[in-house]
């Protein structure tokens, strides 16, 4: 099982929000900022407007799993933030997967030989 390297500190999130490029779909916003490492670091954020705490945690688990499965197919060396939008509580696994693939294609993070 692959380990996900996460953004944990507030300053890390602020840097990506401030200087990163954003790509959005109906349910998810992806913020991307190049880092000087050869790995991707990712942060997950679900605001309080998305359901109750159980729903927010479910959405975070969905995002984390979709990222974990697709990270090997992505370009490395980026800090990413996956931000769930207001209607993200409507997501199921397959819809979340489609949205994530759409965002990675839009941001050119998906490697060319995949999908």
Curated annotation (Swiss-Prot):
GO MF annotation list: 3'-tRNA processing endoribonuclease activity; ribonuclease P activity; tRNA binding
Alphabetized UniProt keyword annotations: Endonuclease, Hydrolase, Nuclease, RNA-binding, tRNA processing
Single Gene Ontology BP annotation: tRNA 5'-leader removal
Keyword Hydrolase: yes
E.C. code: 3.1.26.5
GO cellular component, one term: ribonuclease P complex
InterPro entries cross-referenced by the UniProt entry: Ribosomal_Su5_D2-typ_SF, Ribsml_uS5_D2-typ_fold_subgr, RNase_P
Catalytic activity: Endonucleolytic cleavage of RNA, removing 5'-extranucleotides from tRNA precursor
Gene3D superfamilies the UniProt entry points to: 3.30.230.10
Biological role stated in the UniProt entry: RNaseP catalyzes the removal of the 5'-leader sequence from pre-tRNA to produce the mature 5'-terminus. It can also cleave other RNA substrates such as 4.5S RNA. The protein component plays an auxiliary but essential role in vivo by binding to the 5'-leader sequence and broadening the substrate specificity of the ribozyme.
Classification via HAMAP family: RNase_P (MF_00227)
Family: Belongs to the RnpA family.
Subunit field text: Consists of a catalytic RNA component (M1 or rnpB) and a protein subunit.
Protein name: Ribonuclease P protein component
